[in-house]
Amino acid sequence: MNLRCRICGDEGEQARFEAREQMFGWGDRFPYFLCGRCGCLQIEQVPADLARFYGNGYYSYGSPAYRNALTAWLNGRRDAWAIEGRSAIGRWLHRRRPRQDLLSLRRLKPGPETRILDVGCGAGHFLYALRERGYTRLLGVDPFIDAEIRYPNGLVIERKDVAAVHGEWDVVTFHHSFEHIPDQQATLASAARLLAPGGVCVLRLPVVQSEAWRTYGVDWVQLDAPRHLYLHSVDSVRALAQQAGLTLEAVQHDSTGFQFWGSEQYRQGIPLRDPRSLAVNPASPLFSAEHRAGFERRAEAANAAQAGDQAAFYLRRV
């Protein structure tokens, strides 16, 4: 069957797949296809009732505020290592509780005056950590929060879409929000419009060119049908970037062991939100400590081979 790719426009014969909703275990089925030209795996038709598949608690809108002074200090050390490569104890803390979102900024060498816009930010956990590190020129936007959020530290999260944002920004980030957006071209064009000359858009996304997709197929946990409308490849992100007047400058794989244990659970018929799931009960006996450590080592190897199931894409305005 010939289907038109919504990323590159290819209308050739496309490989088709049927994916199930597996996070909540509802089992609804959705057809996807893999573009033969750009390699983007995409849902054939965006469900008219897409909102109902998010359910209660899909996103974490809880406050990112630190519970006490000790937590704030420990998180500060960890975050200093993630962003700036400083703090020996921070490196150790980061291995225990990683912040890949913050780590994605390191190659950009940001400073307190760097203007950073985060799109689809929820409660603003990413920006809150930056604000606590002394960054002041920050804004988060998300059209799905109930109302504007103002934190005591000065961070503001506005209830709006990126198309409604004004001003000029050095960095625009999408941390696992872009794959949920139906109109990919218009959204990236809006982000590109906001970038200062030489500015960078950082897209952190699931990647279909991955060991996890090759191994698990439609049981790959980050396929996440029907919420993930697009599972990109390097070529499909490059095509989108060119359409928006941006240049794909670098790709940094940052996948974790989740791609393996989550997919193994799906193969066993265990939804991500099931009481037996590691996502719900970290002490679950589903996988031994040895197995979990093996999943993390496997993820590190996949990242090194550019085959991890998620990555940060750096798109520069030139």
Residue ranges and their predicted role:
Residues M1-H175, Q184-L188, H253-D254, P282-F287, ...:
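Conserved N-terminal segment of class I S-adenosyl-L-methionine
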Residues P31, N153-I157, V218-D219, S263-Q268:
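Short low-complexity, flexible loop/linker segments enriched in glycine and/or proline
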Residues H176, H180, H228:
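Histidine-centered divalent metal-coordination motifs
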Residues A19-M23, E249-A283:
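Conserved catalytic loop of SAM-dependent methyltransferase domains
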Residues C201-Y230, D235-L240, Y266:
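Short, glycine-/aromatic-enriched active-site segment of Class I SAM-dependent methyltransferases
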Residues Q185-V200:
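A short glycine-rich, Lys/Arg-flanked "PGG" loop and its adjoining helix->strand segment in the class I
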Residues A147, V208-E211, S255-G257:
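Feature marks short, surface-exposed loop/turn motifs that line or immediately flank catalytic pockets
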